[in-house]
């Protein structure tokens, strides 16, 4: 029906990755791009959802949400700010990874009850590695707080254009491995440790 819609029909196809759609579908579509919400709008959405954040939580969660009210709610409900801080703190020990800290964090994901947190961890690692690659190309982000621990990490790991490419490849590889591993019910603790070791290997090689 999407490729050959009936006469006088209007169909809405919503996609967060339109480039991944089949060309036969895209050629029949008129694009209507929806921009991300501003941080103020995300905060308003959280208030409407009766989710109240502290002054310390609010800026980080709205930034990590990337303009998505749904992602902001998810981050708030799953203590995403605390998980993000734990990841940044552990990765800040690179290129000589604190393996005890990595193991402790990985073991907190044992069991089926942590399935949603594991999905969130994948999203946060995607963000962290993506920002690391971006910083390798554009070292100074005028909107970022240079004193924040995550910004110090991105600056510490950036190694120019070559580093940007390597971090982007590591991000893609880790994301695929983690998502596939969960789909086939591999041990999340093992997957997370493997993730940390791959990141450590990349950091040591640059």
How would you describe each model-predicted region?
Residues 7-10, 16-124, 131, 135-206:
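Charged, glycine-rich active-site and insertion segments that engage polyanionic ligands
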């Amino acid at each position: 029906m999407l490729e050959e819609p009936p006469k006088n029909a209007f169909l809405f196809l919503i996609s967060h990755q339109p480039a991944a759609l089949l060309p036969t579908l895209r050629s029949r579509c008129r694009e209507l791009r929806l921009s991300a919400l501003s941080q103020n709008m995300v905060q308003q959405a959280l208030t409407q959802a009766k989710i109240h954040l502290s002054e310390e939580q609010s800026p980080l969660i709205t930034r990590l949400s990337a303009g998505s009210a749904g992602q902001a709610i998810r981050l708030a409900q799953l203590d995403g700010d605390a998980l993000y801080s734990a990841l940044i703190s552990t990765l800040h020990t690179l290129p000589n990874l604190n393996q005890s800290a990595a193991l402790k964090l990985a073991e907190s994901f044992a069991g089926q009850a942590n399935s949603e947190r594991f999905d969130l961890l994948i999203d946060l690692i995607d963000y962290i590695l993506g920002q690391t690659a971006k910083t390798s190309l554009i070292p100074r982000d005028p909107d970022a707080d240079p004193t924040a621990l995550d910004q110090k990490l991105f600056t510490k790991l950036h190694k120019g254009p070559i580093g940007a490419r390597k971090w982007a490849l590591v991000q893609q590889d880790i994301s695929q491995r983690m998502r596939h591993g969960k789909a086939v019910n591999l041990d999340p603790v093992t997957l997370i440790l493997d993730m940390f070791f791959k990141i450590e290997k990349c950091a040591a090689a640059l």
